[in-house]
Amino acid sequence: FGSLPGSMGKGAGIFKEVASAGGIDSSGPYTGESYDAAALIILAMQAGGKADRMTVQKNVMSVANAPGTKIYPGELKKALDLLAKGKAVNYEGATAVEFTDVGEAFGSFIEKEIKGGKFKDKKQR
């Protein structure tokens, strides 16, 4: 057994497709998390109308958590358009991003098992 940061949810499957279409290997550690971090920064800046640190800080939780339209990998344009119209978004991303009340991200890991000499996803923790 072993573990690897990641998710097995809806967004993870979509991310694999989007990454593959863009020539990106999505199997590495923290690939989905890195994608989500960049997307959240972009969305927070759009929500606040400025591209600076304070704007990101003030808006990242509002674009990452409910309420709002769920946004998955490959839907950044949709999210940017919604925010430009004053609508709320709930960025799910590749890793089902959710922040606690104090701004910490809930993490998830995939438990792996070796069968027939290959790693197989067993479950998400």
Which positions does each model-derived feature cover?
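Extracytosolic ligand-binding ectodomains
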Residues: 1-125
